[in-house]
């Protein structure tokens, strides 16, 4: 599903026209940085098919809202926004072939000056090097795997493999899992945990955050009684629950997402009689997780870490304004990641605006370089900067539980 948004200075509200086209699977050929055309285009690549849809719809709403707030223009140039799906019905989740095709499409459209995405860290590994070759900036509202930007967290060639041009062209507005995993382990100890069993979904994001949790748990004196990758398509996890009971686990951490069966694990822990708290990361911070697991499996049992505060608890003037504007514009509560979609778009628009006011041509390279200079950005998430790796300096995390079918914050860690 692809949605096109054209904003104008007169029309502050969005106009959405569905369009469709075939994605090329051909190899991407490096090209010279194209000059901006009029209009200019911003695209996003997020999983719009499957259970992540509600979360990503909220993120897309945030992007659209940010564009509407600048009147749909940068200087005299109109902004066109296109919402691209990187998921397939067959997988019910992001699809490597579609993400590659989206990157290909963006590269070969000279009007595209910014690529907002991806939602999944594994998807980012595909598009990052392709976009980097042509200076097309990528700003993620959701990727948290540290290895995408920092050495020592993944393969020996990471993150350099994602920067074939030698330049940093990938940025993210969300804290990374070297922060999140440690917060989860600290909280496990805080609630009285002594023996932890660490599960992961065998994907980039899940393995990464589980690995950080495991390392930090050992560092703070928790006993890791088991580590296991799970089959995310399994109908149940009764055998693993039995294994965890035998190991005496009083805390279970799952590095994974709603889409990789976190809800089924939660249900089987409770139905299997395992008296352990269940901790999951931000890949489960969405209403779809609560709906899939059910209140019985979560309330009093589960905790969910998240990179920031829940939308209604945003503390800054800009954060409060985002929350009220979102509710007014869309008639409902934003999901947790809506503000990150909004902030990603705002930082792109701010960079473009600075270039325009300076009389500098809006080209891919100029936009990339200007975003890299982002410092003391005053946004809905607070005041933050991008570091030399493209990571945000914002490190705020929250730990949340579930009550009456809704997320409720237990603590905030700044």
What are these language model-derived features?
Residues 15-18, 22-414:
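Extracytosolic ligand-binding ectodomains
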Residues 5-18:
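Bacterial N-terminal signal peptides
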